[in-house]
A protein has these predicted regions:
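A beta-strand edge to alpha-helix "cap/lid" segment located at domain peripheries
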Residues: 41, 45-110
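Poly-acidic low-complexity segments
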Residues: 8, 12, 105-107
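Soluble or luminal CAZymes and related metallo-dependent hydrolases
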Residues: 8, 38, 81
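A solvent-exposed, acidic/Ser-Thr-rich amphipathic alpha-helical stretch
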Residues: 11-65
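Bulky hydrophobic/aromatic packing residues
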Residues: 4, 20, 33-34, 71-73, ...
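Short, aromatic-enriched amphipathic alpha-helices that serve as compact interaction elements
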Residues: 1-9
């Protein structure tokens, strides 16, 4: 989750390389990316769109090589419309992230 709060692109890419397969896929309502540079770019786009947002993750729920993480944003400027979501994470045989499928919505959707 640290990658989701890391603004500097080079540092974020290093974080992703430490835990993800080189061909990791990230699928969200905004589209699908493949590869760590594209994954990092998607995170960077999120951080640029919501510069005062902190992503807060709940405890992971895991079974059979899959993990679900529920998360929400917290805005340090007092904004009252957080984003809520669920990420479903698949690991490869080396326990590196192979795929993240993200579902998100506003508090009004929850």
């Amino acid at each position: 989750m640290r990658a989701w709060t890391t603004v500097e692109a080079g540092e974020r890419l290093l974080l992703l390389r430490s835990c993800c397969a080189a061909d990791a896929e990230f699928a969200s309502p905004q589209g699908v990316t493949r590869g760590l540079e594209a994954f990092s770019g998607s995170i960077g786009a999120f951080l640029r769109s919501f510069p005062r947002a902190e992503v807060v993750a709940g405890p992971p729920d895991a079974h059979n090589g899959y993990v679900r993480v529920r998360w929400h944003t917290r805005f340090n400027d007092g904004a009252t419309n957080p984003i809520f979501g669920d990420d479903f994470i698949e690991f490869d045989g080396d326990m590196r992230i192979r795929r993240v499928v993200s579902f998100d919505g506003s508090a009004a959707d929850a």
